[in-house]
Amino acid sequence: TRVMPGAKWFSGAKLNYAHHALRHLEDDAEVLVGISQSRARQSLSGADLRAEVSRVRSGLISLGVGHGDRVAGYLPNVCEAVIAFLATASLGAIWTSCAPEFGVGAVLDRFGQVEPKVLFVVDGYRYGRHDVDRSDEIGRLRAGLPTVTSMVVVRHLALARSTESSSPDVIEWSELGNGESDELFIDDVEFDHPLYILYSSGTTGLPKPIVHGHGNITLEHLKVLALHSDMGPSDRFMWFTTTG
């Protein structure tokens, strides 16, 4: 009798989530909007988003990221997080994230298990009227993740740069990929190739990494957005949540 564990779905089929997320976007249409307490409204057109994904993809390649490597984001729910995720996916690398309000121990419990090669971080965030500087937490995260070879800093609060920013393996978001974008290339991967890693709550021990693949998430998002939510190309979607 055949059993489910170990079953393969759509063997031989290849795709990439990033390709399907980007392929129908109109160049001049507003496709990604970021609204934050700490900076002006961000707006990216289809052409802008593809260019930014291409730039960050090139930057990741220059940092040695390739097929199967893990890339982690200690980022809020901002445009840079979406861009970094899509750029990571386009390479066949694997994304994972935690929200910056997580404490250092909670983040290390998660990222430490998946051994990321590159870490995206934010300098801080605003909660109500208060700026929350995460510089100390970033330093402790870096020290606790020996597999990280490069760190990319997103300046969300425009805080003064810490002394660690002078390290050659710490890169500013704006400088990633030399600030330039080329034509966007996307690598096809197997249907079940890992796309991103989420985590269980950790209530019964360490949080357990949960791996989702390109094929199943492409189908799941199509189902939820197009069928369950009846969304089309001109509709807008906001999910009020964090990256955790």
Each model region followed by its residue ranges:
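Conserved pre-ATP/AMP-binding loop-to-beta segment of ANL
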Residues: 28-30, 152-153, 164-199, 206, ...
